[in-house]
């Protein structure tokens, strides 16, 4: 980033979707502390620029409700509630990692767990942002059958974010999985309509439709690359923009 990066910010309030898988590093389950701490340092870099930062965390590193129904024999709704609790565990892990480097944050849950964190209230969340705290949203939208991607779109819209960042393991949207298809084409930009028509499964249809209907762009980037988020916010970096 340049010395004048603070004056070159493209966005002032952003929503970052962090998948549960992004927190487990090379492990097959749970957390990788080094990975979480690296993410926290990247978040601090953005926070120190003066950007208001809201996170929505997934829970797939612990439990994935949509795919657990068959092997466990549980109802899908029950599975989704278990998944919401998994997102709470991830949110608290991130909060503790941020506190280690003196970054104030608040966990707000769509499901009331008052002994652990605050219940999500839109105005309260916005006030935390205005006070310079990172807001970490847990428990999705608080209802089963909705993904945390949909929660990210919803929170981004209702909290007035300029953009939704979708952190992945690659540096944008490709025509196919670049880890499996050597000649997969990477898009610098792609419209919501084209994304849906090509059935590129970056986010679920409900999330993409929400963002499209409210004209909020989605930026897909490599969350695992150190400093990538700050680079993009300051006008650089490698990513794909999904737009109307």
From Swiss-Prot:
Sites where the protein binds UMP: 59, 80, 141-148
Keyword set, alphabetical order: Allosteric enzyme, ATP-binding, Cytoplasm, Kinase, Nucleotide-binding, Pyrimidine biosynthesis, Transferase
Binding site for ATP: 17-20, 60, 64, 168-169, 174, 177
Signal peptide: none
Location of the region described as Involved in allosteric activation by GTP in the Swiss-Prot/TrEMBL record: 25-30
SUPFAM superfamilies: Carbamate kinase-like (SSF53633)
Subcellular location: Cytoplasm
Pathway, per record: Pyrimidine metabolism; CTP biosynthesis via de novo pathway; UDP from UMP (UMPK route): step 1/1
Subunit structure, interactors included: Homohexamer.
Database matches in PANTHER family: URIDYLATE KINASE, URIDYLATE KINASE PUMPKIN, CHLOROPLASTIC
The protein's name: Uridylate kinase
């Amino acid at each position: 980033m340049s010395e004048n990066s603070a004056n070159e910010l493209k966005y002032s309030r952003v929503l970052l979707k962090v998948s549960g898988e992004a927190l487990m590093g090379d492990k097959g389950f749970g957390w990788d502390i080094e990975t979480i701490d690296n993410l926290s340092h990247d978040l601090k870099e953005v926070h120190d620029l003066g950007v208001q930062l809201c996170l929505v965390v997934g829970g797939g590193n612990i439990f994935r409700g949509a795919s657990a129904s068959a092997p466990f024999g549980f109802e899908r709704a029950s599975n989704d509630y278990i998944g919401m609790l998994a997102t709470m565990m991830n949110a608290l892990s991130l909060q503790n990692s941020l506190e280690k480097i003196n970054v104030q944050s608040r966990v707000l849950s769509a499901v009331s767990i008052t002994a652990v964190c605050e219940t999500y209230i839109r105005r309260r969340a916005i006030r935390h942002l205005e006070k310079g705290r990172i807001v970490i949203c847990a428990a999705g939208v608080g209802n089963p059958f909705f993904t945390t991607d949909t929660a990210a779109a919803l929170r981004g819209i209702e909290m007035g974010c300029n953009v939704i960042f979708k952190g992945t393991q690659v540096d944008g949207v490709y025509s196919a999985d670049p880890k499996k298809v050597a000649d997969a084409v990477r898009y610098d930009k792609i419209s919501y309509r084209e994304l849906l028509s090509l059935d590129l499964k970056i986010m679920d249809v409900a999330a993409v439709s929400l963002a499209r209907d409210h004209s909020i762009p989605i930026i897909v980037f490599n969350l695992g690359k150190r400093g990538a988020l700050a680079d993009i916010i300051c006008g650089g970096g490698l990513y794909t923009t999904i737009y109307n």
